């Protein structure tokens, strides 16, 4: 996982509430055996017409938003079935953070495990962020737990252990390996006849 301390980037807003994991990444893409290469499948049913061509009315197809790294969205983002692939698609598109009113709990955890920072902000803040032009930038300061845009700033909460994972770039296994010596000593203690 990449470290995340302070990120500055542009936004892309899909302000729908109740976006589920099947809308994020349809089931036909779950057969892939790799953890990378899902960017073209993100919001597949909304991004493409039935003939496979781009839907010009969908914001992910807006040429001015192709470098957006912060997704602004509605309430209950990522509800539905457990689908880690959906977070891989967000990450592969280039999103470093998703700002929503609330998250499906499984998607929230999958974000924290895959380096996409999930941030919950109130509707008024998200509405302000959703109106930004393609070139206006937003800064996310994780150490201060703030989202900053021009003269606006909003505080967000995050569990201290998840915050540490982002700040250090460590995943669950990396954090466990910090205790390798203690784990080995404990294993010797409980199995002295090895």
From Swiss-Prot:
Keywords: Amino-acid biosynthesis, Branched-chain amino acid biosynthesis, Leucine biosynthesis, Lyase. GO terms for cellular component: 3-isopropylmalate dehydratase complex. InterPro entries: 3-IsopropMal_deHydase_ssu, Aconitase/3IPM_dehydase_swvl, AconitaseA/IPMdHydase_ssu_swvl, IPMI_Swivel, LeuD. Gene3D superfamilies: Aconitase, domain 4. One of its GO terms (biological process) is L-leucine biosynthetic process. It catalyses: (2R,3S)-3-isopropylmalate = (2S)-2-isopropylmalate. Transmembrane segments: none annotated. The keyword Amino-acid biosynthesis applies. GO terms for molecular function: 3-isopropylmalate dehydratase activity. The keyword Transport does not apply. Pathway: Amino-acid biosynthesis; L-leucine biosynthesis; L-leucine from 3-methyl-2-oxobutanoate: step 2/4. Its EC number is 4.2.1.33. It holds the Pfam family Aconitase_C. Belongs to the LeuD family. LeuD type 1 subfamily. Heterodimer of LeuC and LeuD. Catalyzes the isomerization between 2-isopropylmalate and 3-isopropylmalate, via the formation of 2-isopropylmaleate. NCBIfam families: leuD (TIGR00171), PRK01641.1 (NF002458). This is 3-isopropylmalate dehydratase small subunit. It comes from Limosilactobacillus fermentum (strain NBRC 3956 / LMG 18251) (Lactobacillus fermentum).
